[in-house]
Amino acid sequence: MMVSIDGKIEGYFADAPLTGACGDYYEEVIPKLGDAHGTGSYTACLYMAQADVDYDGFKDTPVEDGDFIVKNEEGKYLFVFDRHGKCNWDDAFSGGMQIVEVLTRTVRKEYLAYLRSKNISYIFAGENDLEPELSLEKMKAYFGIHT
């Protein structure tokens, strides 16, 4: 991952000579640095979550209220802060880490049904906006995250 001085993750600097090597190193090291990694929906959608999803196929699927937790024996998690449910994943893992979507209650039920069909965990951390304290409490309670 490369970041410009103004915090952008894409732009002209992406063509710099060492960008490829730095990106490869980042992908190799991140899973080794702790039991969890966090990213925003923009980054996830740009680099990882680009599957084609037909949400119409999920409109009649019943979805239980509440968080959906899938345990991971490896204990490595990628928390994606995706308050509106925009990330379309191919499967439940990215870079060897299990994906956990951190959502708000504004997410449509078709998206929740899709996540469940892929065995992708999700937690609700706010009504309209994400509440950092609530998301951290749930990360610790459900997944044992301390980093």
Located regions from the model:
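Active-site ligand-binding patch in enzyme domains
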Residues: 3-5, 12-139
